[in-house]
C-alpha cells in the first residue's frame, strides 16, 4: 500500500461486503457438484468408474461432503455467487482497485498444505488453506479481473505479492 501511495495513488482502508465462511460454503457447493460431474464423466469416458485410490484426499473430502448436492442446492449457490458479483460491482463504483496481500504469510513449504487422509472435515480443510490465502477466493468467485504481483522479497528470499482486483470489464486498469 505504501508503494502505491508513493506512486501517487490514494489509499483508503475498506471492508469488503462479504462473509468468507458463507462465500466458501457456496463456492464449495459449486466445486463439489462440478467435481462429481468431472469424476463421473471421466469414468464414462474410460469405461469404468474412478476409484477412490485414484483421487487425492482433498478431492475425496470434497466429494464426500459436497459431491451429492441437489440441483436446487447447486442452483442456489450459483445464484448467490451471481448476487455477490452484483453487490461487488456496486461496491466497486467508488474504487478503481482493491489491494490486498496475496498470502497472509510467506509461501508455504512444499507439501505443507497437503491433505494426507480423509480425517479432516471439509470445513477444516477449507479453513486451513484459506487462513493462508483468504483474499483471492472472493474475486475468483465473482469473476472480477484481478492479478497477483510479486512486489518484494521476504527475509528468507521468497517472493511476496500484492493482489489487485478491479471493476468488471476494466482489465485495462490493472
Question: Where is each model-derived feature located?
Answer:
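Gly/Ser-rich, acidic/histidine-flanked active-site/gating loops
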Residues: 1-33, 62, 67-73
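Structural helix-boundary/capping segments
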Residues: 1-10, 64, 75-79, 86-89, ...
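Generic alpha-helical structural context detector
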Residues: 2, 25-32, 40, 100, ...
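Short, surface-exposed loop/helix-turn segments at secondary-structure junctions
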Residues: 25, 108-133
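Short, hinge-like loop/turn segments at secondary-structure boundaries
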Residues: 28-32, 116-118, 165-166
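Short helix-loop capping/hinge segments that flank enzyme active sites or metal/cofactor-binding pockets
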Residues: 30-89, 101-106, 110-112, 150-159
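Basic phosphate/pyrophosphate-binding loop/patch that engages nucleotide-derived ligands
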Residues: 92
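Short, Asp-centered acidic motifs that coordinate Mg2+ and/or phosphate
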Residues: 96-97
Amino acid at each position: 500500500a505504501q508503494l502505491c501511495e508513493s506512486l501517487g495513488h490514494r489509499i483508503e482502508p475498506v471492508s469488503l461486503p462479504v462473509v468468507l465462511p458463507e462465500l466458501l460454503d457456496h463456492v464449495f457447493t459449486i466445486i463439489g457438484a462440478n467435481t462429481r460431474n468431472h469424476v463421473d464423466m471421466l469414468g464414462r469416458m474410460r469405461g469404468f468408474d474412478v476409484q477412490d485410490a485414484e483421487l487425492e484426499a482433498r478431492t475425496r473430502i470434497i466429494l464426500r461432503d459436497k459431491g451429492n448436492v441437489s440441483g436446487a442446492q447447486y442452483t442456489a449457490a450459483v445464484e448467490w455467487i451471481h448476487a455477490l458479483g452484483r453487490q461487488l460491482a456496486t461496491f466497486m463504483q467508488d474504487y478503481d482497485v482493491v489491494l490486498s496481500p496475496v498470502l497472509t504469510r510467506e509461501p508455504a513449504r512444499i507439501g505443507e498444505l497437503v491433505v494426507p487422509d480423509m480425517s479432516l472435515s471439509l470445513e477444516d480443510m477449507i479453513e486451513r488453506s484459506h487462513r493462508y490465502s483468504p483474499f483471492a477466493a472472493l474475486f475468483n468467485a465473482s469473476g472480477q479481473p484481478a492479478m497477483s504481483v510479486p512486489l518484494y522479497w521476504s527475509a528468507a528470499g521468497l517472493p511476496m505479492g500484492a493482489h489487485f482486483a478491479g471493476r468488471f470489464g476494466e482489465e485495462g486498469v490493472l
